Amino acid sequence: KLLPILKDKWEEDCIIITIDDDTIYENDLIKNLVNDYYEHKCVVGYRGFTPKFDKLEHFDYEKRDNLQNLSLYNFLTGKGGVLYKPEFFHKTKDLIFNDKIYSDTCDKQDDIWFYIVRILNDIKCYTTLKEWHTKDISAIGLYSVFNSKNNNNTLSFTKTIQKLKELHYM
């Protein structure tokens, strides 16, 4: 859902907010995301965590640290709504659109792709324990069906980092 609108708005100074269609959100979600963006000037979302690692290459989706509200390394899951700006990805030019990388390394984990490219662009992420939804109406999600098995998010993350190193993005 992010990539088509991001490509369309690439040269614009605008805010893009992604949400899921299987969730009923708090009435103030958009207002809160925008207000937090103006305060912190970075990616903002309300469902995420601070991973526990000493180097990016040692990322493990299942290892969590105490939440730091503002950090380069905060990981957001799109379910909680995420606020982006196209300029957050400009430093690495059109890397974000390189489907030869992400379709090969993290085709079921777009959150991982956006996370890594955001970090390569040196854009921090703000997250907090703010109410963001009233009801989840999904019967089953991608995480429970695929990504929770065998630590697939971590495996995809590692593959993506390796590929980016091979291509000299890191």
Predicted segments with their positions:
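Active-site acidic Asp-centered loop
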Residues: 19-22
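Conserved catalytic core of nucleotide-sugar-dependent glycosyltransferases
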Residues: 5, 9, 24-99
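A generic fold-level signal
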Residues: 11, 76, 107-109
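C-terminal catalytic/acceptor-binding lobe
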Residues: 91, 95, 99-170
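Short aromatic/hydrophobic "clamp" motif used to bind/position activated sugar donors
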Residues: 16
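Electropositive, surface-exposed helix/loop patches at the edges of structured domains
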Residues: 1-4, 32, 39, 159-170
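Catalytic phosphate/metal-binding cores of nucleic-acid and nucleotide-processing enzymes, i.e., regions
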Residues: 3, 10-12, 37-40, 70, ...
